[in-house]
Amino acid sequence: SITDTVAKRIFYTALYHAFIQPAMFNDCNKEYRGTDKNVYGDPGFTNYTVFSLWDTYRAAHPLYTLVQPERVPDFINSMLAIYEQQGRLPVWHLYGSDTNEMIGIQSVPVIADAILKNMKGFNYERAYQAMKASMMSDYKGLSYVTKLEYIPADKEKESVAKGLEYA
């Protein structure tokens, strides 16, 4: 049997861990190094990194919209800045670089969730254009989806998993 004190300790420790990342990624004057390695001045929002989106888009990011909604526009504006710098929304952004390690582009459902929850502080049209361009790109089998409406297993590894992520 678990005591209330132990249960609370476990809960609040887990909640604390949920908020360790994403991390702020700018200097005290708000300058930051972009994905393209250029240094950018104050963008008008707090720039974030460590978007481990495949791990966080299902639960952590929806949680942020509920309990830390003031951070969400900065997350999304950071993702949109990454899009402007690398030509695609982030996959697994880590301290100024995208690792491209995961299948799918999970920043899309994160942004869509914020739009559906009517969150303010970012440009919906800009977000839509970034999502559309990213999902219409040739990233990891997406060109097959637009041409064939599926990803052939003999042409692309992890075709079923990618198909599920892109659905």
Where are the predicted features?
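Hydrophobic alpha-helical bundle architecture
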Residues: 2, 46, 63-67, 95-97
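A short, ordered amphipathic alpha-helix with a cationic face
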Residues: 47-51, 98-101
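Flexible glycine/proline-enriched surface loops and loop-helix/loop-strand junctions
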Residues: 43-45, 56, 60, 108, ...
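Active-site cavity-forming subdomains of large catalytic enzyme subunits
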Residues: 71, 78, 82-167
